[in-house]
Amino acid sequence: MGNSSSSGSHRPPRPASSESALPPAAAAAEELSSYEAACRSDPELRTFDTTLQRRTSRAISTLAVGVEVRSLSLESLREVTGCLLDMNQEVVRVILDCKKDIWKSPELFDLVEDYFESSLHTLDFCTALDKCLKRARDSQLLLHVALQRFDDEEDNDAAAAGQEDAAPSARYARTLHELRQFKAAGDPFTEEFFSAFQAVYRQQLTMLEKLQQRKHRLDKKVRAIKAWRRVSSIIFATTFAAVLICSVVAAAIAAPPVAAALAAAASIPVGSMGKWIDSLLKGYQDALRGQKEVVSAMQVGTFIAIKDLDSIRVLINRVELEISSMIDCVEFAERDEEAVKFGVEEIKKKLEVFMKSVEDLGEQADRCSRDIRRARTVVLQRIIRHPS
């Protein structure tokens, strides 16, 4: 009994079972199945797998002789070590290719700065437009005064009856004075204003193009997110191959405890690296999502600003045409007395439309300004909300 106990106390500890060192059979089979499917759908992973199989086969073939004689040559160990180092280097290369600090992108923040600068220029343009609208409303006031003067002078028609031969400037002098002031005021939209409009419009178009290009690149990155799954698959395959090779090494030197230790050590990365990859993947996805949210917000804001500017340009053209038409009426009214009456009647017909166009333009200018400020706020919220 004692001898039995004594001999048992010096018996080497039982090697850890392969089940405790390796993932469960079902889990391993599922992982292998997933890896095989990934290889079929991913050319790069398929290339890596081919290289991995070739290196693993070469290492095992080198070890085969050592297994037969239960010993290993230095050359065999060098081959195995080189194979494992090659596989690890391949994993590092893939990870380094994929791991980039996406959110802290100088290009993105340059784009954000450009966006805020262009939006400020557009707001400045809206301020310039307000000044033009004030001049247009002043022109409206001149026309209202001219019509009032005409009514007053019509009321005094009896007093002027004895002056039928008088020049129209004598009978409708005050009316013509106001009409000439309107004519002298001319187009409220100056050449400088149109130059500013063109500059702002081109800037917004350029901004939209930059944002579209950036979004296209981000979309490609999102589609390429399967690279992270490739990393996970590569780590799994490399670990699997390492376990296989280490098992052959252990068999070759006839050391079961070493085999167990190597198997356990090689299997550890399957769980820990998997969690790390998941964490890395989540950070990558969050960073891409944050960039896309910011770029999309800027893209929507820029698109709306361009549409607002298009509407403003259409309304400006309409106001200019109506002013030009009424100036023609004023020039016609300057001919004679009857021309004054006809010109004033035409102006009365056109004035209401002119007033409505100026009002519409003012509302569109306010809308453009509100849209830009709202878009700027949304972009800032997207940036603040995203974790740095």
Curated annotation (Swiss-Prot):
PANTHER family in the record: UPF0496 PROTEIN 1, UPF0496 PROTEIN 3-RELATED
Coiled-coil spans in chain: 198-227, 344-376
Keywords: Coiled coil, Membrane, Transmembrane, Transmembrane helix
Name the record gives this protein: UPF0496 protein 1
Region (Disordered): 1-25
Entry similarity comment: Belongs to the UPF0496 family.
Source superkingdom: Eukaryota
Main localization category: membrane
Subcellular location(s) per record: Membrane
Segments crossing the lipid bilayer: 234-254, 257-277
